[in-house]
């Protein structure tokens, strides 16, 4: 049975992707980060999210994969994305089709004047 956790910027499925289709799996989790491209990501920022995902999944190692546990992982990962945004590691994509500042208003960092 396909379980999923979806937040604004994090989608997790108990499935594998084959030919752009989700195939339910009891042993594989698939992570989709920011499917609507609301944020601007560097490769480093994405790798941080993947590493945090691996860390969170490891904390549930040995436990049953339940809807509740999957939602906890998704929620914790969404909070992690918010922390990356607040630190300026990722930013809002102002060219996105949707402008939803669900994690706070964009910040403009003033450059130092000489």
UniProtKB/Swiss-Prot annotation:
How is it placed in the membrane, per its record?
A: Peripheral membrane protein
User: Could you state one GO cellular component term attached to this entry?
Assistant: plasma membrane-derived thylakoid membrane
| Keywords assigned | Membrane, NAD, NADP, Plastoquinone, Quinone, Thylakoid, Translocase, Transport
Molecular function (GO) terms for this protein are: oxidoreductase activity, acting on NAD(P)H, quinone or similar compound as acceptor; quinone binding
Q: Does the record carry Translocase as a key word? A: yes
Domain of life from the UniProt record: Bacteria
**Family listed:** Belongs to the complex I NdhM subunit family.
Per the entry, what this protein does is: NDH-1 shuttles electrons from an unknown electron donor, via FMN and iron-sulfur (Fe-S) centers, to quinones in the respiratory and/or the photosynthetic chain. The immediate electron acceptor for the enzyme in this species is believed to be plastoquinone. Couples the redox reaction to proton translocation, and thus conserves the redox energy in a proton gradient. Cyanobacterial NDH-1 also plays a role in inorganic carbon-concentration.
Protein name per UniProt? NAD(P)H-quinone oxidoreductase subunit M
Specify the species.
Acaryochloris marina (strain MBIC 11017)
